[in-house]
Amino acid sequence: MEVRHNWTHAEVRDLMEKPFMDLLFEAQLVHRQYQQTNYVQVSTLLSIKTGACPEDCKYCPQSARYTTDIEKERLMEVERVLDAAQKAKNAGSTRFCMGAAWKNPKERDMPHLTDMIKGVKGMGLETCMTLGMLTPDQAKQLATAGLDYYNHNLDTSPEFYGNIITTRTYQDRLDTLSHVRDAGMKICSGGIIGMGESANDRAGLLVELANLPVHPESVPINMLVKVKGTPLEEVDDVEPFDFIRLIAIARIMMPQSAVRLSAGRENMNEQMQALCFMAGANSVFYGCKLLTTPNPSEDKDMMLFNKLGINSQEVSQKPDEIEENELLDRVVERVTARPTKDDLFYDASV
């Protein structure tokens, strides 16, 4: 199968209508053609600035417009961020993601952000940030500091977007992705499933992502975590098989990308997660919280990986560049030498 950038809604709807087992089989064939099997890339996400966001994203408990239990915090000191990054590395993460509840970073924040990037890079970790919209100059500053990935989700289809967010446009998001790519960084961009969108909207999201000039290197697929106090707290649950189907379709449409299980994984049992890995998911967030929602504990993750024969990647290499027995030794080391959980780690629904 060749990598394409001209997908249509009709093609995606056809994939959605395929028998479940046939779809997973096709996705697994694509996965084995383009990705190493039985490997999962592990990332940790830290909220470096929490709450008081001026935007009105209806899914987000960090919005200042909604009454939630989120405690507001200023931008974290660089030293605290580096301490958290070291703990994440010790626990087995290979990528450290830093998220701030902003519409966009201010110029006064940029020196602190670049110091964080340089410090985390110095530990041998890949770096990722999600800070809201960026100007071309800000993107260049982050890239110069060594930022590897920038996360900026499209969230949903262009047609449904206005039902969820009004404080920035869909084009604003696409422009930020363009600035990131022009600055030479890799892109992490996906969406959220379960906000009341239709099947057509889910297809539209994947079409937007897959028809970008270059596919995002990482595609997080979030399952909405309903938080009390947000406008979406009463929305209907996502049908698990529908979610797994979208993982499979994302793998088929973007075969070279990492497809990440992100927010909502805490609500998935082991069997559902296993089917997601079968469908082509090969990246997870690791730690006790994503930004403001629960995430499976490290122990539960490693137990599941061991049951499935999955090895998480210790370093930023292609899995075929690492000896299999070396990876197994590293998994054992993580299980026996893991530090205690730390409330600094947060789960990602960004």
Swiss-Prot record:
Classification via Pfam families: BATS, Radical_SAM
Please give the SUPFAM superfamilies that the UniProt record associates with this protein.
Answer: Radical SAM enzymes
Pathway(s) per entry: Cofactor biosynthesis; biotin biosynthesis; biotin from 7,8-diaminononanoate: step 2/2
- Domain of life, source organism: Bacteria
Record's catalysed reaction(s) = (4R,5S)-dethiobiotin + (sulfur carrier)-SH + 2 reduced [2Fe-2S]-[ferredoxin] + 2 S-adenosyl-L-methionine = (sulfur carrier)-H + biotin + 2 5'-deoxyadenosine + 2 L-methionine + 2 oxidized [2Fe-2S]-[ferredoxin]
One MF annotation (Gene Ontology) recorded for this entry:
2 iron, 2 sulfur cluster binding
Cofactor: how bound: Binds 1 [4Fe-4S] cluster. The cluster is coordinated with 3 cysteines and an exchangeable S-adenosyl-L-methionine.
**Gene Ontology biological process terms, A to Z:** biotin biosynthetic process
Q: Where does [4Fe-4S] cluster bind?
A: 53, 57, 60
- EC top class, in one word? transferase
Task: Outline the extent of the Radical SAM core domain.
Answer: 38-256
Q: What is its EC number?
A: 2.8.1.6
- Database matches in PROSITE patterns: RADICAL_SAM
For [2Fe-2S] cluster, which residues are the binding ones? 97, 128, 188, 260
Named cofactor requirement(s): [4Fe-4S] cluster; [2Fe-2S] cluster
Q: Which residues form a coiled coil?
A: none
Q: Which UniProt keywords apply?
A: 2Fe-2S, 4Fe-4S, Biotin biosynthesis, Iron, Iron-sulfur, Metal-binding, S-adenosyl-L-methionine, Transferase
Tell me the subunit arrangement.
Answer: Homodimer.
Q: What does this protein do?
A: Catalyzes the conversion of dethiobiotin (DTB) to biotin by the insertion of a sulfur atom into dethiobiotin via a radical-based mechanism.
The UniProt family comment states: Belongs to the radical SAM superfamily. Biotin synthase family.
| Name of the protein in question | Biotin synthase
